[in-house]
């Protein structure tokens, strides 16, 4: 297990899922003083048919009961709306595609929850993330999880050194099938529960239906780069770069993909073929930089992920100023999307990254 220096009092973030359930059970088995916290980060739609928050809380309470630990339900909904959801709406309004899970980790799970846990006398917090942590010469390093299919270091890149020092990830050295097996051995009610998908506050409801409640929509044309109209979109915010499904463009030839958004004309620019040149980029500019180590990495050679679960892409890091950097890739990268995160790695070490603003292709047009 990846720990700080002999933590004894640990508070586990119990989400009602199998991963956090096994995390708590393992720590209790290993002799630590363990308590659970269920974080209620969304509350507007508690009676919505798609909302699973209540069931998740019931599952978390049931798990705590079986393990034999206390659990508190703590409401961070106000902080979530202020720090995460407002940003989510702002980015979609600007034509970008944000990743609220990244911000939720930095602002809620490893800030609000961490502050709460420390206030309760905890030495450390634990979560069910598939990531690892190693301490070398007093420095806490965030590493990829051993299960490459589940590695979640991408979503943790905004953690600061002080947050990493107080966090442990007991599942980092395990693979998902083993976690399921352990859940069954511990007789946990979440052993067969399916993994959650999508953004936590949206749940299983259709994304378009949810977003329309908060942002105005405006239909417009789908056009080719040459300006030919080939269809109609239902609102630019509902589409992301590289999207293929849901375009509704008929006719012969290769599938159509979203290549860019023209916010001035309210047009969605689409191209035919996965390998169309407009879908590939050789460089990007990112800002709002955040790093996991006390000193930011030097300019130079690293690998990068511009979306979750993609293969590491070799690149060159160049700083433009204190808050902005450029990444130049060895090979063109597909559908690099403003609003998403570019995360840097040195081998297995997650160094940090930033928010993608622009690429060498005009993908968000505001002229």
UniProtKB/Swiss-Prot annotation:
Site (Interaction with tRNA): 129, 340
Sequence positions that bind ATP: 13-20, 39, 128
GO cellular component: cytoplasm
Keyword terms of this UniProt record: ATP-binding, Cytoplasm, Disulfide bond, Nucleotide-binding, RNA-binding, Transferase, tRNA processing, tRNA-binding
Disulfide bonds: 104-200
EC number assigned by the record: 2.8.1.13
Localisation: Cytoplasm
Domain of life: Bacteria
GO-annotated molecular function: ATP binding; tRNA binding; tRNA-uridine 2-sulfurtransferase activity
UniProt-annotated catalytic positions: 104, 200
Catalysis: reaction(s): S-sulfanyl-L-cysteinyl-[protein] + uridine(34) in tRNA + AH2 + ATP = 2-thiouridine(34) in tRNA + L-cysteinyl-[protein] + A + AMP + diphosphate + H(+)
Interaction with tRNA, as annotated region: 150-152, 307-308
Coiled-coil regions listed: none
GO biological process per UniProt: tRNA wobble position uridine thiolation
Top EC class for this record: transferase
Keyword Nucleotide-binding carried by entry: yes
Region (Interaction with target base in tRNA): 99-101
UniProt key word Membrane: no
PANTHER family the UniProt entry points to: MITOCHONDRIAL TRNA-SPECIFIC 2-THIOURIDYLASE 1, TRNA 5-METHYLAMINOMETHYL-2-THIOURIDYLATE -METHYLTRANSFERASE
Function (record text): Catalyzes the 2-thiolation of uridine at the wobble position (U34) of tRNA, leading to the formation of s(2)U34.
HAMAP family: tRNA_thiouridyl_MnmA
Similarity annotation: Belongs to the MnmA/TRMU family.
Protein name: tRNA-specific 2-thiouridylase MnmA
Organism of provenance: Neisseria meningitidis serogroup C / serotype 2a (strain ATCC 700532 / DSM 15464 / FAM18)
Gene that encodes the chain: mnmA
